Curated annotation (Swiss-Prot):
Function: Transcription factor involved in sterol uptake and regulation of sterol biosynthesis. Binds to sterol regulatory elements (SRE) with the consensus sequence 5'-TCGTATA-3' present in ERG2 and ERG3 promoters and regulates transcription of ERG2 and ERG3 in response to sterol levels. Seems to be involved in activation of DAN2 and DAN3 cell wall mannoproteins.
Annotated Gene Ontology cellular component terms: membrane; nucleus; perinuclear region of cytoplasm
Superkingdom as given in the UniProt entry: Eukaryota
Name this protein carries in UniProt: Sterol regulatory element-binding protein ECM22
Species for this entry: Saccharomyces cerevisiae (strain ATCC 204508 / S288c)
Bias (Basic residues): 25-40
A GO MF term: sequence-specific DNA binding
Ranges in coiled-coil conformation: none
Length: 814
């Protein structure tokens, strides 16, 4: 080794900072891998990637040829010199600051543009509203033709709500005191309204109407203003939104607003006292026989029906022309929701039957000492109840198990439902089903074993088979002796298996056609031709009606025969399930079926009032009434048109009968006192509420007292039962609001109604069988009602937990 080589080695050792480890010299910074390789900077790409020496043969190097690789020579790129880290950091900071400044400038510019656009838009809107007000002023006169909604131009009517609402509210607030300080501008009216929000309602004329809560009320809220505020809730929400305050309080509008505020009290001086009544109450009074002119009031409230007006019975009281397009959808949704709650409650009740079937059996209604039944005969499982609903349609060739909704108006002989033909016509109808006669497979079917007859079938094997003649004799005299009466249901179960017939349901349908329908007509609900022929025939077209009939018939038969409680529950549950589907598809074809089902459900709820909690029947009655609400209005071709559309809407007829003479002289007699403001035809019928008479025309109790007066006058009419139990569903929203907020006057009126209801049920319970049960759960005094007395009882009656009547939804129209 030469000296030069030795010097070079020493230099390399110094450069690499070699240290000696284990007798070997290694680099201090070595990682254990080769730091350098023999690859050529000008070699092919494959050799560079593999870090091997390339012979640089072109176009193919030797290594790529041996390995059968594509030899590629990429052009040599000059290496970039790295900039110092300090300069890079400085440039990055500079770029960041520049971008931030640019973004800030852009944001400021955008905000300025938005503000400018908003100001321009606001000025344009103000100018447009000033023009609209100038066009509107001639239409606020007293001329009837110019005041009619049809005479207002479309451009004006679209903004009428925004322009008139603040002044209407201001005039209504100051009307009772005849204050001369009503010339405040739009901003002052708005401040007064917002400062006196009804967290507590105070009535000067009715001190008992104060609500709990502390609120700096600077303006007394009269009954008329209270109900008006409810009916115009949606308009207030839109008016008091932040985006619309500027357009109300702008200085350009103040001269016009002051001019209108001065004109409106002057016009009120010449108006009839009827103009203070909310729109919904006014229309109801007009239906009852109050023949005053409504054109001036329609001008003030052109959108009354669309903004919060009580919509449940608009068509019932003659407000169909004001109904909105979504009125039916709202009522259908409410009915479907109520039926869903009823269905859920019925399912929970059926689960209780499953857990403890013997304790829930209604054996006390059947002379349990004379008609004992074995425990096994009464025991029915949950699967029995569910699958029983599928066994309804019967043919003389066999039995099928199919969902009830498959029945969609089959061609049926018109003589099926005739009371004289009884069950024989039903079993001889071959157009209902097409079933293969496979009795062996049917007998072994697991579905049949889980029917309501399933558990009883094993116990019925010991029953001796009987001929059809002996069975007919057994049905003709079910009460011949205690032993035969107690064995009727198990015997029918056994015969159903032997003959492949569901004789229980046949027996229930026959029982309705021969016995039950008489009890409905005797209660004054429609005529015999409806319930004896029309409804049974209609039940074959609509399964929900069939299940409703069978449930009601089972309830009636269970008073004399034991073992039918589970049939009542299962048929009612299936009827509710199918009604939920049917109420979403209301048509002229199924209207009568829905009305009949609702009426039967009401009667069935009354008949089973004592079998559950004391308030459960109220929940079911209210839910059934929602079906009647959903099908409104009924067509004149309906069998129930005279019963529902005329009788129920006639509750207040002739109660209020102001003469046309008073209407013609409203302007001249306006200052004569309160003679024109009271209803002389309403006579006190209960001394406990005598202080509420005479009833003023703007009283929040007017409609309710008119209904009760009508009920007392026509107590002996045949249809009184349906009227008295449907009364809570007909309450107007103003009275409902007072009742739900604890108004003492409203509670006293409902106590009077309860006294009427209690006295009526006690009087006729021996004549009408389905009122006997409800008379047992009604306390002697309404204050003894579980939960706190009259208000709680009536709140149950008015909703009982229905979502449509909860306080959450109630706040929507407060």
């Amino acid at each position: 080794m030469t000296s030069d080589d030795g010097n070079a080695g020493q230099e390399r050792e110094k450069d690499a900072e070699l240290i000696e480890v284990g007798g070997k010299k290694v680099s201090k910074t070595s990682t254990g891998k080769r730091k350098f390789h023999n690859k050529s900077k000008t070699g092919c790409d494959n050799c560079k990637r593999r870090r091997v020496k390339c012979d640089e043969g072109k176009p193919f190097c030797k290594k790529c040829t041996n390995m059968k690789l594509d030899c590629v020579y990429s052009p040599i790129q000059p290496r970039r010199r790295k900039d110092s880290s300090s300069s890079k950091f400085a440039s990055a900071v500079h770029d960041r600051v520049g971008k931030k400044n640019l973004s800030d400038n852009a944001i400021m510019l955008q905000q300025q543009q938005q503000q400018l656009h908003h100001q321009q838009e606001q000025q344009f809107r103000q100018q447009q509203q000033v023009q609209l007000q100038q066009q509107l002023l001639p239409h606020v006169g007293t001329d009837e033709q110019s005041n009619s909604p049809n005479s207002v131009p479309p451009s004006v009517s679209n903004n009428m709500e925004n322009l008139l609402l603040p002044h209407l509210l201001a005039s209504l607030v100051n009307n009772t005191s005849n204050s001369t300080n009503s010339s405040a501008n739009g901003a002052e009216a708005h401040n007064n309204i917002t400062q006196t929000a009804p967290s507590s309602m105070i009535n000067n004329n009715h001190p008992n109407m104060a609500l709990p809560g502390n609120s700096p009320l600077s303006i007394p809220i009269t009954p008329s203003f209270q109900s008006t505020a409810m009916n115009l809730s949606s308009s207030l929400n839109g008016l008091l939104s932040p985006g619309r305050l500027n357009s109300v309080t702008n200085g350009l509008q103040q001269p016009q607003l002051q001019q209108q505020n001065q004109q409106i009290p002057q016009q009120q001086g010449t108006q009839s006292p009827f103009s203070n009544i909310p729109f919904d109450q006014l229309a109801q009074l007009n239906k009852m026989g109050l023949n005053f002119n409504m054109k001036s009031f329609n001008t003030l409230f052109p959108y009354g029906a669309a903004n919060g007006m009580a919509s449940e019975f608009q068509e019932l009281f003659g407000l169909g022309k004001f109904a909105t397009s979504n009125n039916r959808a709202i009522k259908v949704s409410t009915a479907e929701e109520a039926l869903a709650n009823m269905q859920q409650e019925q399912e929970d009740k059926n689960k209780q039957f499953t857990k403890n079937p013997l304790d829930n059996t209604k054996t006390d209604a059947v002379n349990s000492g004379n008609n004992p039944l074995n425990g096994n005969e009464n025991k029915v499982t949950a699967s029995d109840i569910l699958s029983h609903n599928k066994n309804l349609i019967i043919d003389n060739t066999g039995l099928t198990i199919s969902p009830p909704h498959t029945l969609s108006k089959p061609s049926i002989d018109q003589n099926i439902a005739s009371p004289s033909t009884g069950v024989s016509n039903v079993t001889s109808t071959k157009s209902l089903l097409s079933i293969p006669d496979n009795r062996t497979a049917l007998g072994n079917s697991p579905t049949l074993k889980t029917s309501p007859m399933g558990d009883l079938l094993s116990n019925s094997e010991a029953l001796s088979p009987r001929s059809s003649n002996s069975h007919t004799q057994q049905q003709s005299s079910p009460h011949s002796n205690a032993s035969s009466a107690s064995r009727l249901v198990p015997e029918l179960v056994g015969l159903s298996r032997k003959s492949n017939l569901n004789l229980i349901d046949l027996k229930l349908f026959h029982h309705y056609c021969t016995d039950v329908w008489h009890t409905i007509t005797e209660a004054g609900i429609s005529g015999p031709e409806v319930w004896s022929t029309y409804i049974p025939d209609l039940a074959f077209h609509f399964p929900f009606l069939m299940h409703t009939i069978l449930a009601f018939s089972a309830t009636h038969l269970s008073r004399t025969e034991a073992g039918l409680d589970n049939y009542v529950s299962s048929h009612r549950l299936e009827a509710l399930r199918l009604l939920r589907e049917a109420v979403l598809e209301i048509s002229d074809d199924n209207t009568d079926a829905l009305v009949a089902s609702a009426l039967i459900l009401i009667l069935d709820s009354l008949a089973n009032a004592s079998s559950s909690s004391p308030t459960a029947w109220i929940f079911h009655v209210k839910g059934a009434v929602t079906i009647l609400t959903a099908v409104w209005p009924l067509s004149e071709t309906s069998k129930f048109y005279n019963l529902i559309s005329v009788d129920l809407s006639d509750l207040g007829e002739a109660v209020i009968n102001q003469s046309n003479h008073n209407n013609d002289n409203d302007n001249s007699n306006n200052g004569d006192g309160n003679n024109n403001n009271t209803i002389s035809e309403l006579v006190c019928f209960d001394e406990s509420i005598a202080d509420l008479y005479p009833v003023e025309i703007d009283s929040p109790y007017l409609i309710t007292l008119a209904y009760l007066d009508k009920l007392h006058r026509e107590k002996n009419q045949l249809d009184f039962m349906l009227r008295v139990f449907s009364f809570p569903a007909l309450l107007d929203r103003t009275f409902l609001a007072l009742l739900m907020t604890g108004d003492l006057g409203a509670m006293r009126i409902m106590r009077s109604y309860y006294t009427l209801l209690r006295g009526y049920t006690t009087e006729i319970k021996d004549k009408v069988w389905f009122l006997d049960s409800v008379s047992q759960v009604l306390p002697q005094d309404v204050d003894e009602y579980s939960g706190g007395g009259g208000m709680h009882m009536m709140l149950d009656f008015l909703g009982g937990g229905l979502p449509s009547m909860t306080t959450t939804n109630f706040s929507a129209f407060m």
